[in-house]
Swiss-Prot record:
Pfam families: RRT14. InterPro entries: Rrt14. The gene is RRT14. This is Regulator of rDNA transcription 14. Its main location: nucleus. Belongs to the RRT14 family. The lineage of its organism: Eukaryota, Fungi, Dikarya, Ascomycota, Saccharomycotina. Residues 197-206 have a biased composition (Acidic residues). It is found in: Nucleus, Nucleolus. Disulfide bonds: none annotated. Residues 178-206 are annotated as: Disordered. The modification Phosphoserine is found at residues 197, 202-203. It comes from the Eukaryota. GO terms for cellular component: nucleolus.
Length: 206
């Protein structure tokens, strides 16, 4: 009698476990109720199921944390954008009212002070932008000037080298023996040697 009750309780427990497995871990093989010889195997399966359940819970918690974090970031961005849009709309409406009152000549002291402050701030921004543009232009001019000076210096150096070479070439020619009369060494070209008249020179040519 006690054996049958024990067997029945085993089947009931197995059915409950299989039901949980099918809901939580679809696809996991079902546990079969066996006799006491396979109690060790059942114990190892129970441990495996327990580990799988814990791992699944951890993964679910991690996914929930990621989803919550992502939702929080999205919500924060929406709130920030909504606030910025609201501020821009309010500022636009305020400027339109100021413009209308200025055209009608009905500005209050408070509106006039705010308008002057706004104009001053915009002027400072414009000056800042102009200054940045001037700095950029000045930097470009400096770069162009440096580039121009570099090219000019290179051209000057080449010109100096050419002049030096020409001068050196002329000096070498002047000091060379080729410029002397090869017939009468030591005489200046164009002059007749001593004892030789121009007439003799001409007769020789005849």
């Amino acid at each position: 009698m006690s054996s049958s009750l024990s067997q029945t309780s085993k089947y009931q427990a197995t059915s409950v476990v299989n039901g949980l497995l099918s809901n939580l871990l679809p696809g996991v093989p079902k546990i079969r109720a066996n006799n006491g010889k396979t109690s060790v195997n059942n114990g190892s399966k129970a441990q495996l199921i327990d580990r799988n359940l814990k791992k699944r819970v951890q993964l679910q918690n991690r996914d929930v944390h990621k989803i919550k974090k992502k939702c929080k970031l999205v919500k924060k961005k929406k709130v920030k954008k909504h606030k910025l849009d609201k501020e821009q709309l309010e500022q636009l409406a305020k400027h339109q009212v100021l413009k209308k009152h200025q055209q009608e000549g009905t500005l209050t002291d408070h509106e006039r002070k705010y308008l002057n402050k706004l104009i001053k701030r915009n002027s400072q921004n414009l000056r800042s932008w102009d200054l940045e543009e001037e700095v950029r232009d000045e930097l470009e001019d400096i770069q162009q000037s440096i580039l121009k000076d570099t090219v000019s210096t290179a051209n000057t150096d080449r010109s100096k080298r050419r002049r030096f070479k020409r001068k050196q070439f002329k000096e070498d020619i002047k000091g060379s023996d080729f410029v002397k009369d090869h017939r009468y060494p030591g005489l200046t070209p164009g002059l007749a040697p001593v004892g030789l008249s121009d007439e003799e020179d001409s007769s020789e040519e005849d």
